[in-house]
Amino acid sequence: MLELADWRPEDIKIQASKVSNTPLLQRPPPPLTSPLPAHPSTTVATPPPPIPNLLSCHDYKGGYHPSESAQGQFPAPPEPIYTAAHLHLISTFVYFSHNLVSIPPSPWINTLHRNGVRVLGTFIVEHHVGSTALSRLLDKGSEGEYIFATQLALIAETYGFDGWLMNIEASFPGESFRPGELQAFLRELRSAVAELVPGGQVIWYDALTVLNQVHWQNGLTLLNAPFFAVTDGMFTNYGWREPQLQATRIMADSMNRVPDIYTGIDCFGRGSLGGGGFGVGEALSAIWRAGTSAALFAPGWTYEHFDGKDFETVDRRFWVGDGGDVEGSSVKPVSYFVSEKACGGSEFFVTNFNRGFGKGWWVDGIVCSTPRAHTPTPCPADIKGFV
């Protein structure tokens, strides 16, 4: 927390490559009557609309890999890298690690912003170590402002991303915890982010309750609603079942904020309905019926679980299917339940088909180097790219 308190925007002048240079592309609004997937008529008389928003929480092997650096990785190891290829389904991307403050690498921000995807960093405090950080979180400055709300908003503005996932998985120390004070902090953080970052958001994670206990509610309840009320959304824990989900829907509807609930699914299973993996469709089906948004935690499962083998095929099957009969299959991909978002602008779409990694480096048709190279960002126009 001391390092966070001492941070200043001018500190990154010598690290300009770590700052995003791409503003968030504004996606065109959806048509008034969005086309619906052909859901089975036996489910409901009139199918509900697709899941409104999908959050992808990028928890991948601890984060901050060489291939994610601004300069990429060159020469690169022979195995493929994890990339996010189905951005037309994603509304918000969270870069997650177990550091206190996780700032998304600039290549991720640039790539996602080009496709209209909002990018959030993560502020996380965990276990007994987290209580030490929480002892200072609500510190105020000389003018009564919350010091760390100001700092987090400035970091988002400086690095060019769009806000924060606030994940408090520890109790505040002592007996003086007051939920109203944490609410005031979150309200100020939300206001500061909105002022400094156009379209910025703060999303609360379902862990800490108003009783100062880490007690995952697996939905919206009276114990976490006060924190949801002062943020832009809530990412629920993954252990819910349909009765809890329906109760969440009813409570969120009373607040007129159903789409602001991001019902969580752990892609590795770990208590999620459907068991994660290709079974996420079972959880998404329940979310689809309830009408909330959804959040996928660790979709890098498509790479990690298979050690990168046949990654593109596995990832495609997870997100959009393998081209077979989706209606007749018990295993349905993410795209079956989620509304597609436009990629590109309302009047343009541009691609050079450069995926940012390949078997060598070519410039003007001439081989410059044959070792593999990796970067999550497609090459800029002045670099002809990978093949």
Model-predicted segments: where are they?
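Non-catalytic accessory regions flanking glycosidase/transglycosidase catalytic cores in CAZymes
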Residues: M1-P107, T111-R114, R118, L138-A149, ...
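Glutamate identity and glutamate-enriched acidic tracts
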Residues: E3-D6, E10-D11, E68, E79, ...
